[in-house]
């Protein structure tokens, strides 16, 4: 059972500021594979049922930005366009999609802005969403009359005004940004579009999962479960299974 935000306990100095690659590989891939994730602090929620300003109270963790695992539905039964209606408004894509992973993309990052009201006359707000979805996924209609497009996408929600102020503060303080970690060359193909939490066609052996996650933690080592890491990685010597419980990287925005 998922803990409530009040039940979660973190060591002093803990910050959750993962890179795009870490979000896709360590969280989204594992979620779609029904594998344990490093930190159970991302809420499972159909965020398209709510206005963005209601979401922070539903998140397990976050101060200026909040993370959610959410399903994604089709706009039309036989189409591939996602339904972006949400709460009393809608999300509208902005800018170009960003591939995550090289040389072969593992995921896709899309930026969206929330508009209050009905399209095309909605009022633009300061609420931003970064939506991460898996690349190389079969999103064809797999069940008659099913509107499910993705079982899970990972979403980061924040208010643009707060983010701008935080970034300016970091620059003035001379803080260095977190360096992105290079992802693997490939990841197992995932099949989505079912009504289940994990598509039945999806399989992921320990070897494939180890290759997909073959890089060290850079922000949440201290709370990784040693037994789970050892079992998942199958003896991969790159990751130490003896973690210092007090070592937590101080995150930056």
Swiss-Prot record:
Residues 10-160 form the NAC domain. SUPFAM superfamilies: NAC domain. One of its GO terms (cellular component) is nucleus. Its main location: nucleus. GO terms for biological process: embryo development ending in seed dormancy; positive regulation of DNA-templated transcription; positive regulation of leaf senescence; regulation of root hair elongation. The NAC domain includes a DNA binding domain and a dimerization domain. This is NAC transcription factor 32. It comes from the Eukaryota.
């Amino acid at each position: 059972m998922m803990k409530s935000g009040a039940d979660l306990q973190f060591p002093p100095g803990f910050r959750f500021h993962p890179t795009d690659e870490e979000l896709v590989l360590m969280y989204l891939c594992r979620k779609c594979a029904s594998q344990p994730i490093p930190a159970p602090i991302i809420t499972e929620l159909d965020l398209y049922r709510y206005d963005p300003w209601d979401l922070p109270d539903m998140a397990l963790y976050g101060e200026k930005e909040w993370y959610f695992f959410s399903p994604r539905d089709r706009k039309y039964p036989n189409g591939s366009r996602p339904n972006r209606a949400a709460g009393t408004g809608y999300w509208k894509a902005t800018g170009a999609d960003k591939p995550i992973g090289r040389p072969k993309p593992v995921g896709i990052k899309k930026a969206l802005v929330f508009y209050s009201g009905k399209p095309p006359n909605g009022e633009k707000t300061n609420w931003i969403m970064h939506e991460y979805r898996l690349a190389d996924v079969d999103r064809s209609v797999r069940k008659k009359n099913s509107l499910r497009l993705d079982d899970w996408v990972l979403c980061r929600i924040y208010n643009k005004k707060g983010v701008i102020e935080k970034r300016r503060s970091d620059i003035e303080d001379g803080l260095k940004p977190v360096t992105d970690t290079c992802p693997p060359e490939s990841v197992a193909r995932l099949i989505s579009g079912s009504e289940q939490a994990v598509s039945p066609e999806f399989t992921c052996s320990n070897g494939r999962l180890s290759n997909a996650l073959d890089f060290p933690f850079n922000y949440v080592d201290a709370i990784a479960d040693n037994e789970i890491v050892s079992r998942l990685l199958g003896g991969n010597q790159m990751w130490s299974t003896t973690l210092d419980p007090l070592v937590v990287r101080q995150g930056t925005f």
